[in-house]
């Protein structure tokens, strides 16, 4: 659906690739990344590497794919107990609601949830391999180490303690992760792209990963982590808490190296920065773009070879006014702006109608395409007569200012945000309407599932009308007429893609809109929570960001082009020569039950 139509199958997600890259740099070379959007028939019970089931099976999932993740866990539990892999879960679902994947409700459970980043996983594996005896199955090692309390000093985990019948008695939370301070120490993303499973309809695995020559054809856009964190504290956003109010960046040298290697080894020319707010700190941003502007790839300037985009806020874009030409010279061609509400009625991040219009004008003058992202909310009408408060009024202004694409989502409760529980207790959250009930995949912002209005169906139709007002045959025709005056021939393409996406969005959401219109609306005041006790370890306090080179006693050796992570425990146990087999399925947008 909009706004992710078609991109969901054309971008291999950065998160699961980062885990795969970390495993490769840690010595686990026999790793496979299975993307659900490419391999919809994949079943863990059918996976084989070198003729046997892997020792370690990991699932990365967003909240909207929670049901699919549970199905994966259940299928993996069908493997014979003697060869059953250790099952780990990660991703946003595991970070904010780990208990839901650990058997708190009686369903088949994962063994442990990783509630942090790559190095939490590597720290866990180092602990397990230090206790491994010979070729002892990794899951048996985990159970033994877990029962003796050996996991309690690894921040960023949640695991279950069970009785003799394997019934969950309590969940143990080892506390917040210790953040990686220097993002240059992250594993190089080039390794993750070399682990992708070939797209197919098979239930099992191919003999080998997707050839390098075919990677860019299936994933033409490469998403890269450039920065983490945002200085704004929006009540509906979980990002500040996850990043522990810190802002972390990669250096321009590291980013240039990643783009160069991905371009040279896989043929990537399109990149998307997985940033929360790329312009968050102007001084750090300038260091990055200054280096990229001086970088050469394949014999020419980077901006002649590479097309990349990222996300930022309107206010921070205005703070970069004098430097936007340099940003463009660094190769930035498009920026997705968190406009939310131009009048700052929903949230005030320093944006205003004049400021937003000026930011769009400055970006266009610099040769950068502005891509607005909006949030619809209860207090915003569809149309207003005397001001710019209405949704269609703002869509009109954004289109007039040069917006090429449009994103309109309804504000929804987000686990991990400050307002999450209050949204439920205040009676805003819908449990169902008519014969339909709210399911996990409806938490993506396309469905109105939280509203104080007696007629929430109006908001559902407002979103569709806003998209129809922006994407339609008339606008396609006008974009073709204005083609010579625009920066890029992106207008007609965006209109055609947008109209196709609108068709899918109508097909997927119209039933819910009609249920809201005709059915009885049911609300809930209880937010999702664990049905079993969660014990927070006193020995796992909130810790500051650290240098992981010190944590691993100097065994992490980051070299800009050949970054490696060496763990003496792995080599001593022979993991380098006979690596533990890993499996990484990824549950991704638009893959719903």
What are these regions (language model features)?
Residues 2-5, 49-55, 97, 162-165, ...:
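Radical SAM enzyme core and accessory elements
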Residues 5-16:
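Glycine- and acidic-residue-enriched helix-capping/strand-helix junction motifs
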Residues 98-105, 322-323, 381-399:
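Catalytic cores of alpha/beta
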Residues 168-171, 184-185, 189-371, 376-380, ...:
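Radical SAM [4Fe-4S] cluster-binding motif and immediate context
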């Amino acid at each position: 659906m909009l706004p992710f139509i078609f991109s969901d199958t054309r971008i291999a997600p950065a998160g699961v690739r980062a885990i795969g890259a970390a495993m490769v740099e840690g010595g686990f070379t026999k790793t496979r990344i299975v993307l659900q959007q490419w391999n919809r028939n994949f079943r863990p019970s059918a996976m084989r590497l070198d003729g046997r089931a892997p020792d370690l099976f990991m699932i990365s999932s967003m909240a909207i794919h929670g049901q699919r993740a549970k199905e994966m866990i259940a299928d993996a539990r069908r493997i014979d107990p003697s060869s059953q892999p250790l099952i780990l879960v990660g991703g946003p679902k595991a970070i904010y609601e780990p208990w839901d994947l650990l058997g708190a409700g009686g369903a088949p459970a994962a063994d442990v949830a990783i509630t942090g980043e790559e190095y939490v996983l590597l720290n866990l594996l180092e602990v397990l391999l230090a206790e491994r005896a010979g070729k002892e199955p990794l899951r048996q090692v985990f159970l033994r180490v877990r029962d003796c309390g050996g996991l309690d000093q690894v921040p960023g985990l949640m695991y279950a303690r069970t009785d003799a019948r394997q019934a969950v008695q309590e969940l143990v939370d080892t506390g917040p992760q210790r953040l990686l301070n220097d993002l240059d120490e992250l594993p190089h993303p080039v390794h993750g792209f070399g682990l992708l499973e070939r797209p197919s309809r098979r239930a099992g695995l191919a003999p080998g990963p997707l050839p390098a020559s075919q990677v860019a054809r299936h994933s033409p856009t490469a998403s890269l982590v450039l920065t983490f964190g945002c200085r704004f504290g929006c009540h509906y956003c979980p990002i500040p808490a996850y990043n522990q109010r810190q802002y972390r960046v990669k250096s321009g040298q590291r980013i240039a190296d990643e783009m160069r290697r991905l371009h040279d080894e896989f043929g990537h020319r399109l990149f998307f920065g997985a940033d929360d707010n790329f312009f968050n700190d102007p001084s750090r941003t300038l260091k990055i773009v200054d280096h990229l502007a001086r970088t050469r790839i394949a014999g020419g300037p980077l901006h002649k070879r590479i097309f990349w985009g990222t996300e930022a806020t309107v206010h921070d874009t205005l703070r970069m006014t004098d430097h936007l030409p340099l940003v463009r010279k660094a190769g930035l061609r498009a920026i997705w702006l968190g406009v939310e509400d131009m009048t700052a009625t929903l949230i005030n991040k320093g944006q205003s109608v004049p400021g937003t219009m000026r930011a769009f004008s400055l970006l266009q003058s610099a040769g950068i395409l502005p891509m607005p992202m909006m949030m619809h909310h209860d207090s915003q009408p569809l149309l207003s007569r005397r001001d710019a408060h209405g949704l269609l009024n703002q869509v009109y202004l954004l289109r007039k200012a040069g917006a090429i694409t449009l994103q309109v989502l309804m504000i929804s409760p987000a686990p991990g945000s400050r307002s999450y529980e209050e949204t439920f207790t205040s009676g805003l959250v819908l449990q169902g309407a008519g014969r339909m009930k709210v399911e996990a995949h409806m938490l993506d912002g396309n469905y109105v599932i939280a509203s104080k209005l007696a007629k929430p169906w109006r908001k559902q139709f407002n979103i569709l009308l806003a998209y129809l007002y922006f994407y339609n045959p008339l606008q396609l025709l006008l974009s073709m007429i204005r083609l010579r005056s625009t920066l890029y021939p992106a207008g007609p393409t965006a209109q055609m893609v947008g109209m196709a996406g609108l068709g899918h969005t109508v097909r997927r959401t119209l039933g819910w809109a009609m249920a809201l219109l005709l059915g009885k609306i049911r609300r809930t005041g209880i937010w999702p929570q664990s049905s079993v006790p969660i014990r927070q370890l006193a020995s796992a306090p909130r810790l500051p960001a650290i240098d992981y080179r010190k944590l691993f006693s100097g065994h992490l050796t980051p070299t800009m082009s050949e970054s490696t992570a060496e763990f003496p425990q792995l080599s001593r146990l022979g993991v380098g020569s006979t690596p533990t087999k890993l499996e990484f399925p990824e549950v991704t947008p638009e893959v719903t039950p």
